[in-house]
Structure formats: structure tokens, C-alpha cells
Amino acid sequence: MYGDSSKMASSTSKSLAEILQPVKRLRSLSPSRETLAPRSCISIRSDPSVGTGVSGEFKLESPSSLTVEQRSRMEFNKYLARSKRNVRLCIERIENAKAEGIEYAKLEELLMEETWLEALQGELQNPYWKNLCRFVESELRGVVPIYPPPHLIFNALNSTPFDRVKAVIIGQDPYHGPGQAMGLAFSVPEGIKPPSSLINIFKELQKDVGCSIPMHGNLERWAVQGVLLLNTVLTVRKHQANSHARKGWEPFTDAVIRTISEKKRGIVFILWGNSAQEKSKLIDATKHHILKAAHPSGLSANRGFFGCRHFSKTNEMLKRLGLSPIDWQL
């Protein structure tokens, strides 16, 4: 554990180019629209008649001419385009700050999703938030890299709009190895070897709902469909697990969970492991569904994670509410 943010200030400066320096991948995969549209056990595949145009603008078809499956694909593509837009805007803000001679964009400027800014109105004015911003900015100036890269710090919120949330999977802090963290709990970019916890999630997924185990660990499809993949701490130092714990992230992510509980109804909260289950006190169990199991790590997966059937249970709950189920296939 590290000291207060005031003691961790700036050693040698590093540029954003260094912060965002590409990492070495196991293989280079450039997802196309075909690979990003949901596929599945439920099966929602990409369709040339539905999707985004060359300009990235979403193309609408006449609702009366679309099947249920086509409407599902159209909705997925719309939110995928929105997620990509939010990431692009974050990158632009970082580049603009650099062009103005500023080493980094302000932390609050990287939360792009309007629905979350509205839902969390006032939260970014709290004293803890100002202290958190100072801490993260001092870490960005430091010699030890932090993960994920700045434009992906709020990827969970920027990928899953507040009004889109159907389920919440709570993680701890980001993966601390180079290239692993992408701002979505448990997820790694395509081309990066899935960690053991994610492999165990895929094994349970296969046994529970019959989905095939994917060749990658990118959970973006889940996020775009309404599964909020939220870590309780959103940044970490390279090779130093929990190094940004108790620096201000927990009050913020607690506020996210509490806001969902207070302002929405019928959300499925998936809590794996003791750390995630501690967050159940923030959730109104009379309004929402809470699923608990052991953490999927190699040390605890055999103590209650395997066989929990949380994926099928989530979809059963969503169907009872009249909502479309999650296509868990990656």
C-alpha cells in the first residue's frame, strides 16, 4: 500500500505518448463489424441490412420491415457505435490537451457518457473526487505506468449507458500486467491471453448455457448489451495489485452502485467473491436480484463458482421482467 496522494506526486514526467504506448500483443486482431456483432447460443449475428454506415452514423430501417432478430442487431450496433464514439472522444480530449501543452486531460473530462453524467449529477463535486483527481494526475506524471490507459479509465460507464444497464458484474481493480486492462471488469483486449479467472468464467459459461469458449477475452459484447462490468477501483500501478485502493475510487464506484439501486428496478447484480459481496449493502434487495458465488480465480473457483449458473439465472430473471436476455456468446 502506498501513502497519501500528496506524497506520491511527480517524479520524472512522462508524455501521454508514453502512457498510451502500444503494448506487445500475442497476435494482432482488428475486429470488424462482423466480429463485433453479437453471435450466439441465442444467436444474434451481423446483418448487411442493419448497422452503421461508412461514416459511422447509425442506419435506421423501417421498423415494420424488421424481424425481432434484426431489431436486436440494430439495437446492438447502435450502442456499439455509441461506445466507440465515447472512446474516440476521450482520445480526442487527450490529444487536444497535449496540443495545448498539457500532459494529460482532466479525469472528469474522460467520463463521456451523458446518461451517467446526469445520473451521477453532483457526485463529481464531492471533496473525495477532487482528491482522487489530484492523485490520479500525480500518478500519470510518475515514472511507473498506470493501467488502463487514460482513455479507457471510464470504459465501463462509457460502454454501458445508465439507461441500458440490465446486469452488473463487480470486479476489484484492473489487471496490472502490460496491455491487459481495458476498463471492463475481467475483460482483456483481443490478442491478450485471458487470465485464469476469465478462463474459469468461460468454462462456467459453456457448462451453464452451452456457449463455446472464445479464443479471446474481450467482453465488450456484454457491456454493449447492458452488462455493466464495473471494477471497484478503476486504476492500478503496473505490477502492483491494489496500489490504487483506498485513494478515492471506492466512494465513486459505490455511488455508481447506489445510484443504480435507487434509480432503477429489476437489475441483476452478480457478486463473485467476498470483496464484491460486500457491496450488497448498497443494493436494495427488495427491488433487485442479487446472485452470489465464489470468485472465479483459480484458488476459489471450485468452492462455489463452478456450477453457480449465474448466466442462465440472469437471463431467466430478465425474461420474467419482459427484457431481452443477454447473448453471452463472444
What are these regions (language model features)?
Residues 1-147, 329-330:
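N-terminal intrinsically disordered, compositionally biased regulatory/targeting segments
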Residues 305:
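The substrate-binding groove and active-site-proximal loops of carbohydrate-active enzymes
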Residues 86, 90-101, 109-268, 275-278, ...:
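A polyanion-binding, active-site-adjacent surface
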Residues 318-319:
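Short loop/turn segments that flank or connect secondary-structure elements
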